[in-house]
């Protein structure tokens, strides 16, 4: 049995769809029936992605984090359980609201997100230290940066102490110390996050510079591989043993990119945790993300393994 643990955020998504975003001081109409709510947060989305894209007979997925004592928290726990995610170590915080993300999705599928952390702010160092036994026994720990940074740092140290591989998705993007990066087995930023990690925020990764960016991030001590996602251009990887390649994205019409990155992380994590080759795992992740972007919603857009297995007509960009 492969044990995958996700430590991270859980948010309720409040989504508004619109042809274009309003400018400052401007009021516009969104799409008719364009408002929806649903479970989200990078942590929860990635846990759901791992669960839906794995076989429950050989994979256990657990969520670590906090929700508020409100209706959003109840719905979050119910949704995670329904997807087969273990929530025994999700803590309900009294007199706190569950995290909220306000998401504006344009006609092109591009999105803008505003976060209110709520109970996610209670995922502190004390919480993480109390989870040491759970972290120490997993095969892979997945983390993002929607919880307090000091909690992420402690979790990295615990995982390192027990020889547990960590996949870090450094989003939302903030600078990280070289020590923190060196505790990661897999570092998976997008083009903007990679630039911020390298203190080059004005120069996002492109096809022309992505190899140099990946090499520099590897030099900080990433143990196995750096994967830089490039949106519709795919993902570039470079491993510690020198292997590198661009894995093309699948050619589809995007409707909503909100959960594309989280689907990619979940799919890749499940595949690599089960011992699949790096490139094969990334190709699987690209296929899963291509299905996600053709649907509206966050967690609701993440496909199941059965759906992915049945989608053989996706073409790669050339």
Curated annotation (Swiss-Prot):
Activity regulation statement: Activated by a monovalent cation that binds near, but not in, the active site. The most likely occupant of the site in vivo is potassium. Ion binding induces a conformational change that may alter substrate affinity.
Keywords of this entry: ATP-binding, Carbohydrate metabolism, Cytoplasm, Kinase, Magnesium, Metal-binding, Nucleotide-binding, Nucleus, Potassium, Transferase
Record's protein name: Ribokinase
EC number in record: 2.7.1.15
Residue pairs linked by disulfide bridges in the UniProt entry: none
Gene for this chain: rbk1
Record: residues binding ATP: 190, 229-234, 261-262
Record's subcellular location: Cytoplasm; Nucleus
Pathway: Carbohydrate metabolism; D-ribose degradation; D-ribose 5-phosphate from beta-D-ribopyranose: step 2/2
Function: Catalyzes the phosphorylation of ribose at O-5 in a reaction requiring ATP and magnesium. The resulting D-ribose-5-phosphate can then be used either for sythesis of nucleotides, histidine, and tryptophan, or as a component of the pentose phosphate pathway.
Co-factor(s): Mg(2+)
A GO-annotated cellular component: cytosol
Main enzyme class: transferase
UniProt signal peptide: none
Xref: PROSITE patterns: PFKB_KINASES_2
One of the record's GO molecular function terms: metal ion binding
Gene3D superfamilies in the cross-refs: 3.40.1190.20
């Amino acid at each position: 049995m492969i044990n995958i643990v996700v430590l991270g955020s859980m948010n309720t998504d409040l989504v508004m769809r619109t042809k274009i975003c309003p400018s400052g001081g401007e009021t516009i109409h969104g799409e008719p029936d364009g408002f929806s709510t649903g479970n989200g947060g990078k942590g929860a989305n990635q846990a759901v992605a791992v669960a839906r894209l794995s076989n429950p007979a050989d994979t256990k997925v657990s969520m670590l984090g906090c929700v508020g004592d409100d209706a959003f928290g109840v719905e979050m726990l119910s949704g995670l359980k329904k997807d087969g995610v273990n929530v025994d170590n999700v803590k309900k915080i009294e007199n706190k609201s569950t995290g909220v993300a306000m998401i504006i999705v344009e006609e092109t599928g591009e999105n803008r997100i505003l976060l209110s952390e709520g109970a996610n702010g209670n995922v502190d160092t004390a919480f993480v230290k109390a989870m040491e036994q759970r972290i120490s026994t997993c095969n892979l720990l997945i983390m993002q940066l929607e919880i307090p940074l000091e909690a992420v740092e402690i979790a990295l140290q615990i995982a390192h102490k027990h020889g547990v591989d960590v996949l870090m998705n450094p989003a939302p993007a903030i600078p990280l110390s070289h020590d923190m990066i060196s505790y990661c087995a897999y570092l998976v930023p997008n083009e903007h996050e990679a630039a911020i990690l390298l203190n080059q925020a004005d120069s996002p990764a492109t096809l022309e510079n992505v190899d140099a960016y990946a090499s520099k991030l590897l030099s900080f001590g990433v143990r196995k591989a750096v994967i830089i996602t490039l949106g519709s251009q795919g993902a570039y990887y470079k491993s510690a043993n020198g292997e590198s390649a661009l894995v093309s994205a699948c050619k589809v019409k995007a409707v909503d990119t909100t959960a594309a990155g989280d689907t990619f992380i979940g799919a890749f994590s499940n595949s690599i945790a089960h011992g699949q080759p790096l490139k094969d795992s990334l190709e699987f992740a690209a296929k899963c993300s291509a299905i996600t972007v053709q649907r509206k919603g966050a967690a609701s857009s993440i496909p199941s393994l059965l759906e992915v297995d049945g989608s053989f007509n996706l073409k790669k960009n050339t």
